[in-house]
Amino acid sequence: SNDDIVIEGLTRLGYDREDAHNYVVAACWEFIIPGRGMDIPNIDALSFVKAVEDATLDGLENCSSYDEFEALVNENISRQADEICRNTENVHMFPAPFLSLMMEGCVENARDISLGCRYNNYGIHGTGISTAVDSMAAIKKYVFDTEMIDKRILVDALSKNFEGYKAIQMVLRDDAPKFGNNDDYADDIAISLLETFARSLEGRRNDRGGIFRPGTGSAMYYIWHS
């Protein structure tokens, strides 16, 4: 991990700088503070792909510009965020007395870790970012910028899983800009999606007084979000 980025990021999220310097990686890639946090860094996940898919199938034909289409995607992201935050209310945690012995403040306050600690933040994963970006980049380029593909034809092709639309499928798959190739055309879309995701969780508090941390990762959601 990159300390220069991680420490500043954790500090902006409200972690004390001393604690931010002491972060560890929890299992996969999420950041937690050992001994001082009851954070759940992957309590649920938001699907970027679902946000793009719904915007495409339900609204693309009515969009006169890419900005209008992007606004639909952003609305879907915010809607998912609302639902996820509601679903995390009143989550029951089983008591963990042995773990509590090792957490700051639990013994002193006669309080089990399941009831909270210094940090009680929930992390929401954003899944499928590369697929979502690739899809939006293809739509931006071929539907709006070059107008090479009619939006109604694209929606019909998607509804038929490209059966009868092989040529369009090959263009979208092989020629469209792709995320992760140092191509600003696609990468700027990724930045926009992530910023929208972050804004959708900004200022929210869970029922333990913690914040909702946005993050990325598709592990274990390959099937659930497919």
Please report, for each region that a protein language model flagged, where it lies by residue.
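Conserved catalytic cores of very large enzyme subunits
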Residues: 1-226
